[in-house]
């Protein structure tokens, strides 16, 4: 495949045919998903570079096929593979090689209509050379190797680039132009590779497979994130408490614990949450929706995490064990509360007397001493009492009657 990245205008006239490779329908079927993705990406990049460098020609039929998501095949006729993997500077050599092969009477590799082992190996070689050419032209193109002088300056933001092609791509950010449209849903993209990644949503194609568990992904970035699970690596650390996370978004969610930020508010009652998933579960409270049902007892829950926690009551599973004493718990929250026994941490403090507790429930019980009530319980009591109930009856509904003290209880006569 012609893996050519045109970063400056060539000294000789160049057509799209000079930097493209065609497949027959038979040959296209022999390529695996990774090779097809590489081919599409390079062809679209070649076309966009030629256009950006000022070459005027009508859109090639091959590009129209790729943008529509069709296969790039042509009629089953022999054609030259010698151009694959070469740069613009090798154009003369490519034509000479082509002419020599044509007149020597030998069949070209890759022109095997039956798709034999020799032909398939040749095609793989072409794709491999294409991938290598892509890397070579990126690393040692006309603007020099990595670390070369950044001579191409963006006039709008002042950012500099070592390649003119990178500057051209960067300018699209300022213009807001999105020239690549999805033929199925019409969504627009700034880069051709972004369109190719998006089209996998429609096709269901997942070319990136995890070598350890075989799980597949539509994007290489998602595969890289997934592989962190197998490595056990947790590269994202919280600056406040040092807790480590596998994903950057998990660290962002955790940081809200320290900042107290709750950006997700319920439009019905105004209650706010630090996670969008918690808001979704909460909204089911208003609708009375409980979509997650236990298969053993038919009990239903608002969230899948609640269902999983409940199912452990049937299985007896307690996967969260304390490292200090070995005590195990069904849920992570139970383990977190238990750890405070060892650490002595008491994060729940009474606003009236300053006494602290390891559990929120114990704080609520203690606040009854001061006559305080939980806001949620008070609101429930007002609803039960009905509108306009402000007398002693509402107070009785809000709190249960106090238990008599031991000293006030009459002693029972002993039985003899």
Swiss-Prot record:
Zinc finger (C2H2-type): 152-174, 180-202, 208-230, 236-258, 264-286, 292-314, 320-342, 348-370
Domain of life: Eukaryota
Any one GO molecular-function label of the UniProt entry: zinc ion binding
Stretches assigned to the KRAB domain: 14-85
Pfam family, one: zf-C2H2
GO biological process: regulation of transcription by RNA polymerase II
Compartments, as annotated in UniProt: Nucleus
Gene Ontology cellular-component annotations: nucleus
Function: KRAB domain-containing zinc-finger protein that represses B1/Alu SINE transposable elements and modulates the transcription of nearby genes in a tissue-specific manner. It regulates glucose homeostasis and lipid metabolism by modulating the expression of the endocrine cell-defining transcription factor, MAFB, in pancreatic islets and, the fat metabolism regulator, ACACB, in adipose tissue and muscle.
Name under which the protein is recorded: Zinc finger protein 92 homolog
Organism encoding this protein: Homo sapiens
Taxonomic classification: Eukaryota, Metazoa, Chordata, Craniata, Vertebrata
